[in-house]
Amino acid sequence: MITASVLFVVFIGVNLGMIIYGNSYVYPLSDISEIGDADCIIVLGAAVYDDGSMSYPLRQRVEMGERLYKSGISERILVSGDHSRENYDEVNVMKAALEDSGISSQVIFTDHAGFDTYDSMYRAKEIFKAKKVVIVTQRFHLPRAIFIARCLGLDAYGVAADEDGRYFNLKTEVRELFARPKYIFDAIFKPTPKFQGEAIPIWGEASLSDG
């Protein structure tokens, strides 16, 4: 009984601590210029449908990524998501949507092995050599993404993709409660993701990341 109580307190403490810490680096779009220029904007992937269309959360992320880019906070965008199968590709869907908005493919880098939040942040630093980043995802997800990024040594900030109207999904919110404690261990021990590859510096040629 005591053990269960202690675990519950730790569980709640980890969640609250990560939320408070992560949110201290979250900015509204209108104030993001306060952080100065960033190496890149990281747009994190989410589900795409069989017909290639974006899920609502992914559409929010891409649209906020576009707005951030056009605000001038960074000259580079890194779209990071799951492209583990030939018939499932979050990354090129995001890239195509950004191109349709008028952003040149020459400034859009693609990370095809961003299978989870940790992999995306690790690869942003180690493969794309970013140092200062602005992360775009939903508000519930930002604290964990920022926490992981900063534990890995990135100077990371965030803008909520849903700042104009919060995205809420009960299943997703509950899953996030359990994901935060799990990623504490990744942040501490810093495991190497399965997929590595050659360095593609974010200040170089975006076409080198195409796939």
Model-based region annotation:
Residues 28, 57, 181, 191-193, ...:
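Proline-rich intrinsically disordered, low-complexity coils
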Residues 1-35, 195-202, 209:
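N-terminal membrane-anchoring alpha-helices
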Residues 170-195:
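A transmembrane-helix-recognition feature enriched in membrane-embedded lipid enzymes
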Residues 18-174, 178:
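A structural signal for short, hydrophobic/glycine-enriched beta-strand patches
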Residues 115-121, 141-149, 191-211:
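Electropositive, surface-exposed helix/loop patches at the edges of structured domains
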